[in-house]
Amino acid sequence: MLSEDKIIALYCIVDDMLKALRHKEDVRVRVSDSEVITTAFVAALYFGGHLDYARQFMKCKGYAPQMLDKSRFCRRLHRVSEPLLVMFFELGQYLKDMAGASDYVLDSFPVAVCQNVRIKRCKVLKGKQWHGRCAALAQYFYGVRVQVLTLHGVPVEFCLMPGRENDYGVLQRLPFHVAPESCIYMDAGYTHYQTEDLAFDADAIHLMIGRRANSSRPDEPHIRYLKERMRKGIETTFSEIKAKMLRCIHAVTEKGFLLKVALFVIAFAFYKII
C-alpha cells in the first residue's frame, strides 16, 4: 500500500547508502540522485514501472518539488544504473553477512517483452537468444529469464539472462557470496554435478538441487521432501514481484527494458526490509 512513511523510509535508506558508497554528483543538480532512485522505486512498487506517473506523483505530493521533466529523468536514471546495482548487492551482502550459514533458494521466472504474435515486429529486443520456454507454464516467451537468489523471501542476488539460456548457466554467473555451510535450494533444471562438487570442495556450499527420476545421484525420501518444501517459498516471492508488473513493460530500448526489469527486483528487495 502506498504510504508517506514508506516513501520517506525508501529515500532515507537510498540516501544513506549513496553517502556510504561516497557517491559524487554534480553540485548544480536540482534533483539529487537519491530522489531519482526513490522515484524509480515508487514507479516499480506502485505504478507498474510507469516512470512518468511516479515522476508526476512525487512532484505533486511535494516529495521532489524540483522534479525533472520526462526526458531528463530517464537520462538521469540511466546514469545512476550502476550505483543502483552496487547498492543492491551491498544490501544483499549485508543481509547475507548477518544471516551467516543459512538456507537460500534460487529460481527463475520469465519476463516477456511482448506477446508471441508480436515477436517479428518487436524492436526492443532482437535475436533468437531471447526466445525461451518456461517449463512451469509450459509455454514459450520472448524476453529475459530473471534468476533470483533469496534469503527468507528477500532477493540478495540476481541476474538477467536471455530467455534461450538454460537455468544451470546461472551457476557460472552469480557470485554466490554466502557463508560456508550454507545451503542453496534449486529445482532439477539447475543440475550440473561438476559445479555442485566444486562448490562444496572449494567453498563448503551445499547446492541442494532437486533430482530427476533418472538421476544418477538419487535422493533419500527425507532429503527429497526437504528440497521440495524449501523451494515453495520462492514462488510466493515471485508472485509478489510479478504482481507489481504491468501486462507489458513499456520500454523503447534494450537497455531501458533490462533496467526496468531489474528495478522491480531491486525495489522489491528494499521494500521488504522496511
Question: Language-model segments: what does each one mean?
Answer:
Residues M1-I274:
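Short alpha-helical elements
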